[in-house]
């Protein structure tokens, strides 16, 4: 798991997300507390439970982006889910328990990748030997078995050197490789994904791993053999146990759009995708044991981060038990013109940099002036104020409209340089921004 300090985490988030310092600090502290807990003695460690977070803020201000970036920083099992995808137990649709199953699958994949990376050096050696056995078969004793007591021949060592230097990459050889597992597609109604996964695993296990001769270039064969040999060196049972432990101790679940499962006003009849889902989430957030195909997983120490815009509802519309299990509240602020200007220039892969790089592939050089960027930011802010406020996502719409002519003609304009200044932006956007009906439908 990540050993970054809160200040380092915030600094890393700052290079991708503008503003929202309170939210960044909250997730940075929560992530660091995961590491701090693991430094405690076992008795006290069991008592320290994570403080779950509720992020509140309008759409397009960075809630989901914080989750995406956090997933890369955490170096721990992480899953992002939409609250609207789930229904109450007993109804058609996904149950909330599938969150933990998916998290465990992600952990198994992560732990397997880490284990294979650790074994890569040994796997590379074994893969080399298998290729050399095809190129220069080893000497055999009187019983027809390869004689391992003999030193490798000078020819074999020469070929090994050539193989490592890449001189044999384009040479074709015939070698036995593990055949791809038999694929069995099973159609099942929604909510039955777990059953179909188990059936598919069963059919694959019945088929077993078979070796199949293939004619292939050495470069490709080496890649496949390294993966095959690394997989043999990994213990599947040990890997499953490590994955379950990683989920239980370091797992993070991000639940987006939680405001969409709030009960609004008094409604009669079953509310299978709102209050029912909240009730089903309670045991997961509080701590329970979920059965997965890899084993039983306890959720007591999994960190839950929920987020929602809460534009037509408020956090108090969540059922009281769930409110109590999300003790840390963080409010994200609506974006201003200055924020939009910073979003266009400061992040490491800002929108303006992306458009410059895209046009450079056609040989067109794009330059954004400071005044032009300010004008784009003002246009996006004005449209947000007059119509629906969709936050930073409005910049995508405005920029796409602004760049439409350049993008269309780029393939015939190789070698040109185009400067996007305040005058250029005004010429292409002023009419749309001023006309509320046009901006409502086009921007």
Swiss-Prot record:
GO terms for cellular component: HslUV protease complex. It is found in: Cytoplasm. Signal peptide: none annotated. Pfam families: AAA, AAA_2. Its main location: cytoplasm. GO terms for biological process: protein unfolding; proteolysis involved in protein catabolic process. Keywords: ATP-binding, Chaperone, Cytoplasm, Nucleotide-binding, Stress response. SUPFAM superfamilies: P-loop containing nucleoside triphosphate hydrolases. InterPro entries: AAA+_ATPase (IPR003593), ATP-dep_Clp_protease_ClpX (IPR050052), ATPase_AAA_core (IPR003959), Clp_ATPase_C (IPR019489), HslU (IPR004491), P-loop_NTPase (IPR027417). ATP binds at residues 18, 60-65, 256, 321, 393. CDD domains: RecA-like_HslU (cd19498). GO terms for molecular function: ATP binding; ATP hydrolysis activity; peptidase activity; proteasome-activating activity. ATPase subunit of a proteasome-like degradation complex; this subunit has chaperone activity. The binding of ATP and its subsequent hydrolysis by HslU are essential for unfolding of protein substrates subsequently hydrolyzed by HslV. HslU recognizes the N-terminal part of its protein substrates and unfolds these before they are guided to HslV for hydrolysis. NCBIfam families: hslU (TIGR00390), PRK05201.1 (NF003544). A double ring-shaped homohexamer of HslV is capped on each side by a ring-shaped HslU homohexamer. The assembly of the HslU/HslV complex is dependent on binding of ATP. Belongs to the ClpX chaperone family. HslU subfamily. This is ATP-dependent protease ATPase subunit HslU. The gene is hslU.
